[in-house]
């Protein structure tokens, strides 16, 4: 049944905390969460709880939750509350007693769909914090944020405010009154853009994104992920995504990239394209594309608001083409140039805008016909170099649920990287029943490339 036009506006009148419905770009970002993790000198969990509860609401982005009205998500203004065992946890039963060991182990993607406000279960809380004493000298912090509030790059801007909380309580560990009562973070506004994302850009021609980009139409229909190693009788609840982290020497990688005119992103693309050709015994000339998030804030079409925005999700996808050159270094250089060729064509802006069109503003009805390349049925891999972040040994993860009804064929494999001055950490997201031979070929290519 078709809804009446602007049926939802009545709710905005009734509740002033409702900001607006999520548009098509934001809508699908409510189904996944991003996680920033790092290790710190030992601090008291209760000190963090009290100090964060007072200070993080100073930063507007922490006060945006998601409220469902007639099953549709809306941006909702509600002050961040750290509710123990709802969105704040102290972990005492971690098996690993070393942070580096923890990163290297397989970790189940935690379902946090039950991260609901106990006072109003129509509100999904956007943030979750987990504190774990790894050993007598270190404390691990895991911050999880709903994807609509951040992309991989802006997630660590948000996490930097958590670092400020930790720095403060470590510095003032003997002053309980200060930790419990001091509000030291200055207010930081986070303005939600208008529905549809269009107002974020200057001189954006609507014709540019109303038609399907030629590059998307180039991606061939060719399944390049093997079926999961499961049979039809398996308990579907036993199928889920797992993450694992791999650590490399960034200084060596940086020197290699500079010397050979390549990039970390081209290394990720090369790793996946070479592994795919090797597993399927494909000819070198077989084109394989990569879903490559690219920061829209750097576009020459971005307005001042978007250029200066430090929160929310603003990454749109490029789809650089990879063709094997018969030589590893030549592959890296080819893929580096392929990425550069995509950027001036504004493909990332087009992907954002086409995604935003998936929701009708008047009725909020769904029309998911973006025609964006599909990871399960087309020759398209997925990887992203998020870039440099602050931290001691930070790590990035994605949390999402798998399509349990068609998990055998419909899933994603994704590799994302972040780096500091010394370390580059790659996260691998894949299903727990992934074909072991296929995955091992990817890891072998990764080790071969990132240990150059």
How does the language model describe each region?
Residues 247-263:
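Surface-exposed, Lys/Arg-rich phosphate-binding patches that contact polyanionic backbones
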Residues 108-109, 115-169, 178-188, 417-442:
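Histidine-centered acyl-transfer/condensation active-site motif
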Residues 1-75, 81, 95-126, 254, ...:
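Acyl-thioester-dependent acyl-group transfer interface
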Residues 150, 163-171, 258, 272-281, ...:
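Hydrophobic/aromatic-lined pockets within catalytic cores
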Residues 44, 151-155, 264-265:
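Hydrophobic (often cysteine-bearing) scaffold residues that line and stabilize catalytic clefts
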Residues 2-23, 149, 153-156, 161-252, ...:
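Non-catalytic, low-complexity flexible loops and terminal extensions
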Residues 264-273:
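Short amphipathic alpha-helical segments
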């Amino acid at each position: 049944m078709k809804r009446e036009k602007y049926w939802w506006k009545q709710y905005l009148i009734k509740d002033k905390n409702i900001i607006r419905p999520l548009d098509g770009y934001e809508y699908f970002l409510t189904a996944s969460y991003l996680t920033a993790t790092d290790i710190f000198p030992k601090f008291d969990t209760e000190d963090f709880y009290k100090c964060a509860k007072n200070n993080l609401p100073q930063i507007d982005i922490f006060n945006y939750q998601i409220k469902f009205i007639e099953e549709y998500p809306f941006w909702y203004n509600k002050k961040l509350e750290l509710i123990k065992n709802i969105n704040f946890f102290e972990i005492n039963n971690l098996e690993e007693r070393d942070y580096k060991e923890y990163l290297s182990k397989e970790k189940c993607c935690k379902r946090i769909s039950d991260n609901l406000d106990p006072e109003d279960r129509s509100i999904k809380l956007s943030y979750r914090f987990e504190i774990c004493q790894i050993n007598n000298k270190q404390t691990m912090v895991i911050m999880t944020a709903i994807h609509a509030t951040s992309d991989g790059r802006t997630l660590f801007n948000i996490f930097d405010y958590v670092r400020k909380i930790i720095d403060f309580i470590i510095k003032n560990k003997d002053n309980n009154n200060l930790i419990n009562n001091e509000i030291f973070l200055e207010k930081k506004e986070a303005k939600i853009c208008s529905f549809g994302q269009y107002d974020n850009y200057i001189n954006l021609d609507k014709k540019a994104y109303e038609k399907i980009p030629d590059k998307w139409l180039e991606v061939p229909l060719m399944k390049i992920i093997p079926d999961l190693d499961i049979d039809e009788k398996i308990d579907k609840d036993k199928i889920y995504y797992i993450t694992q982290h791999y650590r490399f020497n960034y200084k060596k990688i940086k020197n290699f990239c500079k010397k050979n005119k390549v990039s970390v992103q081209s290394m990720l693309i090369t790793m996946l394209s070479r592994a795919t050709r090797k597993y399927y015994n494909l000819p070198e000339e077989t084109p394989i594309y990569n879903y490559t998030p690219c920061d829209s804030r750097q576009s020459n079409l971005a307005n001042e608001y978007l250029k200066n925005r430090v929160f929310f999700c603003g990454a749109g996808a490029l789809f650089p083409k990879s063709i094997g050159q018969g030589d590893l270094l030549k592959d890296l250089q080819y893929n580096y140039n392929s990425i550069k060729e995509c950027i001036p064509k504004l493909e990332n802006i087009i992907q954002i805008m086409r995604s935003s069109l998936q929701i009708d503003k008047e009725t909020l009805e769904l029309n998911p016909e973006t025609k964006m390349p599909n990871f399960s049925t087309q020759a398209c891999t997925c990887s992203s170099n998020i870039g440099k972040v602050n931290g001691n040994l930070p790590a990035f993860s994605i949390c999402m649920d798998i399509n349990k009804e068609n998990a055998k064929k419909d899933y994603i494999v994704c590799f994302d990287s972040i780096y500091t001055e010394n370390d580059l950490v790659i996260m691998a997201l894949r299903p727990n029943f992934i074909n072991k031979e296929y995955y091992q070929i990817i890891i072998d290519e990764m080790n071969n490339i990132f240990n150059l």
